[in-house]
């Protein structure tokens, strides 16, 4: 809340002498003529997530306010001597006033790095405006467990009594993010030769992928197969291979395979976060 401070000065003459007296400092609180709130649809984010934000401006005064601007810092934070912005404004934006689409009145400016500014001309007494927009998580966003992004909206207008700030925080989602890559060699292969299948299981998430089970249906089915995991040859009891279908671990096995969580490294010079996935690699060989 802003404060209005004021004091009075009295000058007078007594017995031919001019004197001055200053009153005490009087203070009153100045409440804004608007309420400003900021919310998100969902409260978590991940790599490349698209977040939806809603900024709500309500004119609680008895007079209209004009020249309204709302600036969002897109979560900008300090990193060493740099300022990094983990969110990228993703157009378009919508403006709803008392539930009516008035987006034609909305001006959006994202030409200044680290912010986006929304402007509209007026808001009637008692009216409510909702600015709805999206932002995409970019390469500067922290992804480790416990990370968060807080972005703050700042409202200004032609009235000294119509301003304010509001923030919203999203936390990084926790979980594994698995992808699988497979390749075969040589190419081409001749009947009777040995073929090698390489399967890599990547985890781009911040939590390990546990109890991983691999199933592969080969057609045609190779014979005399060998199976290795991360360079270690597995014995026949470590997997099941029947009718061309490979299962690792073996059916009924108590063995648990885990793909480690990714590691996240922020470049000191650029601030960019690099994701290095956890990996488990299987190599299967057999005769075609």
Region spans (language model):
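Exported/extracytosolic protein signature
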Residues: 1-288
């Amino acid at each position: 809340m802003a404060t209005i401070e004021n004091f009075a000065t009295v000058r007078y003459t007594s017995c031919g002498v001019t004197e001055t007296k200053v009153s005490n400092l009087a203070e009153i609180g100045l409440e804004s003529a608007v309420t400003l709130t900021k919310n998100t649809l969902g409260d978590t984010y991940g790599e490349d997530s698209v977040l939806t934000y809603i900024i709500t401006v309500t004119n609680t005064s008895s007079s209209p306010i004009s020249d309204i601007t709302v600036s969002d810092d897109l979560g900008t934070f300090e990193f060493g001597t740099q300022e990094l912005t983990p969110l990228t404004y993703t157009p378009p934006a919508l403006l709803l006033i008392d539930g009516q689409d008035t987006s034609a009145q909305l001006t959006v400016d994202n030409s200044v790095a680290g912010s986006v500014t929304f402007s509209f001309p007026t808001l009637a007494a008692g009216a409510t405006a909702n600015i709805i927009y999206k932002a995409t998580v970019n390469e500067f966003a922290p992804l480790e467990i416990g990370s968060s992004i807080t972005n703050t909206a700042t409202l200004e207008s032609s009235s000294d009594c119509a301003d304010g700030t509001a923030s919203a925080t999203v936390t990084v989602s926790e979980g594994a993010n698995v992808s699988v890559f497979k390749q075969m060699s040589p190419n081409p292969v001749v009947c009777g030769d040995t073929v090698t299948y390489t399967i890599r299981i990547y985890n781009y998430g911040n939590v390990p992928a546990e109890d991983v089970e691999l199933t592969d249906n080969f057609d045609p089915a190779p014979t005399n197969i060998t199976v290795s995991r991360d360079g270690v040859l597995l014995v026949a009891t470590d997997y099941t291979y029947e009718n061309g279908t490979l299962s690792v671990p073996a059916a009924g096995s108590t063995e648990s395979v885990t793909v480690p969580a990714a590691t996240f490294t922020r470049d000191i010079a650029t601030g960019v976060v690099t994701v290095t996935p956890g990996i488990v690699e299987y190599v299967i060989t057999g005769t075609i």
